[in-house]
């Protein structure tokens, strides 16, 4: 066992964004309004992290302490506390001290197999991420796509779920593609510390390519599935999901096939068998579905997979078999036809008909979309819960559980772990990836098999405590008895229902959990902790159930969206603190041994165990549940969940026993039957209108049919009152879902079955009515007795009591009132104790204790007088009551003083004083008066907040300018009306000011309305001067003007960095001068979109000027692309025209993947890297720095490439077929390539034969310098894109002149070393513009310096020139996946794999990104190459100096560094006495 783990847990990269925007008025608890606010949409997914790392416990639910008399009847006591307790969802009841039932189980003989729970697989947010990843992998795998998790240059696995959520927050893949926002997506994804030098281009290309190839087809498949008609149910899938409903209801047996799957469904649905078909090799022809000779699909045809029966052969012996594609319905291209690998599925598709399209027949398994969907639906159904083989008894499990907890927390006794520490640790564990925790839980053990913790009536009670066992075997709170108490409607079932009427027991250990759920049929439940440590509960009141469901949908939309009945599976946990932050009221209960917990109808509840314990639970259903139960049936029908029992059947079982029903039960059954009759009349009228023939109507005793054979095939409701039948296909639905019964038959073919004639129902209704009248007579007599002015005599009360005892109606409340009057003295003592000792007995103030039963100060006096008049001696209790009354009088006196001098006291003072008064728990009229004072103080605060509102000088530039809290006309009127109740001078002054401000604001609203008749910038500035003073006002047209101002301010802030201007909102000069400024295309587009949102600027002169600028920039991009970009380009224009930024990682030996750019030219994509620069000066300085670095590092690149050999080819050495003569070496970087992996460039025609440049060194087509200069004519002079091209032209002229000077000096005999000439030649070859003036000199020098190279490569170069151009370019180059088949990394283990693959990089410097002139100074190499860029890697000396070095400065590649056991620098090697394990060359 391990010790306690560390605190820091990486949790919430998987959490979805849930921020929403709203402008509606919110109401506080006291009914007053709050100013509206607007949240920021699209928040980060890490926003929930603190809820798990620093868990905040929800408030505690009430604890109830019944007296022995109250405890005698559990149903009545629950009914008594229900008005107050129900809103908490779950409450605790502590029984009287004399309730000590013996534990009736032999711990040694009690054996069970607990299930294993993996805590980090049950939390909703984490579970959604894991589910998404597994579904994505399965979809790609079965769709025939080679899928691997993308890895960035640092070896980090890209979090695809997080990437998916970010793309969805940006509007989805289509919008991101259209709006060219992949850079924004990457920026959102990458950590902030990696943004110092912008977003790496390779990463943008990586995520764009992977998303479009693997994730978007998966999302598209989900959308298409959602758009299909969801009306048809998938019976097999529903049964599968039903098995994973971890509810207390009995597991349904497998239903018989009543749906006729051998008919039309064969055509519609693909079988869900999980048996895999035979694997297909690449050369094997697939055998898809077949057609008969007339072109129609053959039913039952299975291709080569099927073993035909003799009947099939006879039926089809004359049919000519033909394979065909179910998408295009064609049988051509049989070698490209795929057959689903699921045994028994006929579905076939061409590779080019698949979505996504497949380039070739896949080697692995391929499944049709329907079978993929079937597999997809099963993912995640039972995650987190696994069956175990180890069997325990209670003693051995106790030993295991206690040892596990002690080992985990590092203590020697389980009692030494605090509740708070354990609770915080639990919520960290549910999201822990680094240290997953698995525990065991003996859950849902049925007592009929393993035994109950309570003695049972049917058990044999022996031993010295046999009488005690017999006593508790009959106790009302014995969970074996509660469901069948006469007041529980479940008692009318003749047989028990496992988990509902027959208890289940639970053996828990530390952290074992039960996830969020409601009870079956929304019944009550009761749980008793027999022994052991605490059980922690969280509850949500039934009235807040929909809030809970909506919150969980926001947190995990992927889970709730794919499972209609997610909330009926006990498999999903969610953080209560997080749910509370989303507006869900949640309360907590700590259940100790010997305590009961009650859950109320539709109350969601969840929790965990602090350690070993043994609990028992069962359901019960008082009469008030009946209406909730019917509502539940409708809810189950909506999500197509099976019922545990038929609600209507239960009702009629009660009606059959009407002689035994009490008044309240009779009334409830009467109301329910009335609804049933009304519904049946409507349905039978509808059946006649539907066209079901009268001869097809029959009466059926549904209760005699097994439940699984009388369920609606669509909504799964167990039918009892009526049903529709399709005789031909043996199908059944409820009348409401008649349109899902059959697709081929008509209502004339249907059969309508019903349980009761309408006359029978009416008769039963009348009989129930008579019984309500009889019992009502008893009620009237009882009421008359209590309304008499004189105290009723004892004799009539006893007579009335005897009448009720002989009756079957059991009017318990009235009988107890009679008994209470008979025991007046006892009642008075109980009242006194309740007043004096309430804090001990209730712990929390609840309405149950203070609503109907609370007395006032006069009542306390009367009680004292009553007790003084009794014949018994109660002086001690009377003295305590008198002291209590004196305290109340003192409090009331102080209340009068505070109200008369309220200006001296703050609102908090009054609130604290009110709390003191509430502690007395009696009616005090002063409390209401004090609350009014508090209300007026709150009113003053809100009024002052408005009246003190003043505009600030630059408020328009505030980030939250548009979203500040403001007030509507109705808000202020309501505030004025509320304040008018007070007559104080202070209030009157505030009201007058509010009225004046409101009048002025309404005038401004009228002015704002007129503005939009003819908006303009000039008018906007003028009107805003007046409106600024009423900025507090929130009305439609002022809001619109405010939006316009905010939009103008945003646009101005975007332009100010480019074209500084004076303060104010005048944009005209700036917008009209944009063409001359250093603006980028991306910023121009962003400005245009901002203008389109503004009614003032949209289609204005200024906007038209901006659109013209964008059009000119697009034309410029098209001209430049035509000159520079080859037909199959793997670089965008920026990467071609700019200096190279890939030299450092290449020198380190990293593999940099290149992605095909596509045929279309998009200005946003071609120049998107320019976004990273804040100014033109910064961009040009960056270009200069890259150019300087190139001269320092390129030799290192050559050394690395030479050492790699053909591993540097774009196939990464995977192509072994070419001979040595078919290999080309790049004249510049010396990387080697197979000829078949290369492309011919027209630029090679200008160079000597045999001269070759690789795809990295020759990125463009090398246009002539004059053509490029001409392309700049008419382009915006100041745009950064044009400056970048001009910079390249200028560079070309300089290096060409330098080349010519070196060559001329060499020819004239002047000093011009070979190295100088080689460098000049290198610079000329590296420039992406060809200057013809330098071409002859370059050719001359190439012949002189590289003669042997040209001769060696002549044959391979000729082969390249003669080879035809590829018709379809590769999607990517230098792709590791094309070189080897690697095992797919497990997302849950990505952190550990990362640390392993970066053994040396794990120590790589804290400087993730090198700045250009500064950060390289920290490198301690003797000759630092001064690299910088996005991915400069460092290594630390493992010897004594601990200095840091650039990897490329120490003479090793990154792979070599990672493979070293340790690294020692040269300085440490010089001082070492023994040989080092590695050598340094820095």
Swiss-Prot record:
Uppermost EC category: oxidoreductase
Ranges annotated as biased composition (Basic residues): 277-288
Span of zinc fingers (PHD-type): 322-374, 1206-1260, 1416-1471
Catalytically driven reaction(s): N(6),N(6),N(6)-trimethyl-L-lysyl(4)-[histone H3] + 3 2-oxoglutarate + 3 O2 = L-lysyl(4)-[histone H3] + 3 formaldehyde + 3 succinate + 3 CO2
Matching InterPro entries: ARID_dom, ARID_dom_sf, JmjC_dom, JmjN, KDM5_C-hel, Lys_sp_deMease-like_dom, Znf_C5HC2, Znf_FYVE_PHD
Classification via SUPFAM superfamilies: ARID-like, Clavaminate synthase-like, FYVE/PHD zinc finger
Ranges of biased composition (kind: Basic and acidic residues): 251-264
Domain of life of the organism encoding this protein: Eukaryota
EC number: 1.14.11.67
Positions of the UniProt region annotated as Disordered: 1-45, 244-316, 1361-1403
Main location group: nucleus
UniProt GO MF annotations: DNA binding; histone H3K4me/H3K4me2/H3K4me3 demethylase activity; zinc ion binding
Localization annotation: Nucleus
Residues binding Fe cation, per UniProt: 517, 520, 605
Database matches in Pfam families: ARID (PF01388), JmjC (PF02373), JmjN (PF02375), KDM5_C-hel (PF21323), PHD (PF00628), PLU-1 (PF08429), zf-C5HC2 (PF02928)
Bias kind Polar residues: ranges: 30-41
Cofactor: Fe(2+)
Domain ARID: 126-223
The protein's name: Lysine-specific demethylase rbr-2
Lineage, broadest ranks: Eukaryota, Metazoa, Ecdysozoa, Nematoda, Chromadorea
